[in-house]
Amino acid sequence: MDLFEYQARDLFAKHGVPVLAGEVIDTPEAAREATEKLGGKSVVKAQVKVGGRGKAGGVKLAADPDEAVARATDILGMDIKGHTVHKVMIAELSPEIEAEYYVSYLLDRTNRTFLAMASVQGGMDIEEVAEKTPEALAKVPVNAVDGVDIAKAREIVAQAKFPADVAEGVAEALVTLWDTFVAEDALLVEVNPLVKTKDGRILALDGKVSLDENADFRQPDHEALEDKDAANPLEAAAKAKNLNYVKLDGEVGIIGNGAGLVMSTLDVVAYAGENHGNVKPANFLDIGGGASAEVMANGLEIILGDPDVRSVFVNVFGGITACDEVANGIVQALALLESKGEKVEKPLVVRLDGNNAELGRKILSDANHPLVQRVDTMDGAADKAAELAAAAK
């Protein structure tokens, strides 16, 4: 989960990373009070999860509270690279800046370790630095057991060739940034720029944080950080039911068990769709191994609630997941939706194979629901689902 700048700033402050004061607001008039709290001057910064805010006009200085209101009025509702600005941060003006640096920690999947990155060339796109002057970007592996103490931080600073007059201050910031990375179960923490001010302070002026959602079970506070405005309502509903769901731009709803099978199903449906009006998969939904009838019912309810879906393909190979449980889930979901007065009109194509497949097929046959069609091969079922979706367009 990627955070907004103001959320990253709050986490930095929580763990001792030096930051400037700031407040997030969502109405122009609130900018007045927030600026007054900061002494009458501020920086108004659009809160979007994309770079290039400054060039897009999403970062403006305000010399007084009235100007802060005007700037907030201009920025709220702005579109920046497809992201609508719903909030702005009213931030304290930085003291005069003498130098800008870059520091970060991230998960290095290739080498199966953590990586510290640091550069004396901050305030710009770090990918550009890595491409044009790779020698200016130090990359230092970090052992997960040892972590980053002040000695390790000094090693990072030395490899990045920070000037002697800021070396200790940057090292101390690196220690607190590592504390943030570990304590918050982050995949990335980045400060760009980390600045040295004329009065000698080291400050984190802007930052990025990406959190590992797999650690949500031990990070209850992270739920409050979710972006409710940007969340797809179907994805939000699926997450609330602990379903692995991703909305796609298509017409055939997909339900399967196991990520590999679901990915294969997407491919097969996309291929079949070429012969049926170029219909495509509408989603990724993995109900997982050992899914119960309740999980199946929850998944089907999400899929049928998608207005883009014209047909549904349920593709299950029973291993830990028993096909009779899947069949019961389908029957229960349809009955539940109809009991709520919801008109279910989207046809379902079901392919069951493996554990208790015959029993699952019998359950569907006995239910004899007019919208459910059984097809016993994956290719045949994909073709039928694509055909039905095309006919309903």
Swiss-Prot record:
Q: Which GO terms describe its biological process?
A: succinyl-CoA metabolic process; tricarboxylic acid cycle
Specify which residues bind ATP according to the UniProt entry for this protein.
K45, G52, R53, G54, E92, P95, E100
Q: Which gene encodes it?
A: sucC
Provide the protein name: Succinate--CoA ligase [ADP-forming] subunit beta
Q: Which residues bind substrate?
A: N257, G319, I320, T321
Q: Which NCBIfam families match?
A: PRK00696.1, sucCoAbeta
Task: Write down the top EC class of this protein.
Answer: ligase
> Is-annotated flag, keyword Nucleotide-binding?
yes
EC number(s) given by UniProt: 6.2.1.5
The job of this chain, per UniProt, is described as: Succinyl-CoA synthetase functions in the citric acid cycle (TCA), coupling the hydrolysis of succinyl-CoA to the synthesis of either ATP or GTP and thus represents the only step of substrate-level phosphorylation in the TCA. The beta subunit provides nucleotide specificity of the enzyme and binds the substrate succinate, while the binding sites for coenzyme A and phosphate are found in the alpha subunit.
Q: Which reactions appear under catalytic activity for this entry?
A: succinate + ATP + CoA = succinyl-CoA + ADP + phosphate; GTP + succinate + CoA = succinyl-CoA + GDP + phosphate
Example of a GO cellular component annotation carried by this entry: cytosol
Which keywords has UniProt assigned to this entry? ATP-binding, Ligase, Magnesium, Metal-binding, Nucleotide-binding, Tricarboxylic acid cycle
Q: How does the record describe its quaternary structure? A: Heterotetramer of two alpha and two beta subunits.
Pathway membership: Carbohydrate metabolism; tricarboxylic acid cycle; succinate from succinyl-CoA (ligase route): step 1/1
Q: Cofactors per UniProt? A: Mg(2+)
Task: Report the cofactor remark.
Answer: Binds 1 Mg(2+) ion per subunit.
Q: Which residues bind Mg(2+)?
A: N192, D206
Domain ATP-grasp residue range list: 9-237
